[in-house]
Amino acid sequence: MLTRVPVLILAVIVMLALCQEPEKPEKRPALLSRYGRAVLPRYGKRSGNLMESSQNSLTEESSDVVCQLIDGKYICLPVDAVRFRPFFL
């Protein structure tokens, strides 16, 4: 009888511990630099997004391009490039 009581108490404590919901990780505030701007990870710089948007705008403006293979590299120029047309003839 004396050994059953501590075992039952231990079993109840273990069951209560297992039945509890897992805690959500705490959200920490964003790291701010001394100027109040968010510190970005090394490979997540905002300038990369600007470059992608500028490339998209370039492809929208000049959709027709002429490409030529020279020394294993493709050189592509817009069709409107009058000064480069003798190069492709």
Curated annotation (Swiss-Prot):
Disruption phenotype: Eggs are retained in the body as normal during starvation but the number of eggs laid during the initial refeeding period is reduced and satiety-induced suppression of pharyngeal pumping is slower than wild-type. Transmembrane segments: none annotated. GO terms for molecular function: neuropeptide receptor binding. Keywords: Amidation, Cleavage on pair of basic residues, Neuropeptide, Secreted, Signal. GO terms for biological process: determination of adult lifespan; negative regulation of feeding behavior; negative regulation of locomotion; neuropeptide signaling pathway; positive regulation of egg-laying behavior. Residues 20-26, 47-89 form a propeptide. Expressed in the M1 and M2 pharyngeal neurons from where the LURY-1-1 and LURY-1-2 peptides are secreted. The modification Tyrosine amide is found at Y35, Y43. GO terms for cellular component: extracellular region. Residues 1-19 form the signal peptide. This is Luqin-like RYamide peptides lury-1. It comes from Caenorhabditis elegans. The lineage of its organism: Eukaryota, Metazoa, Ecdysozoa, Nematoda, Chromadorea.
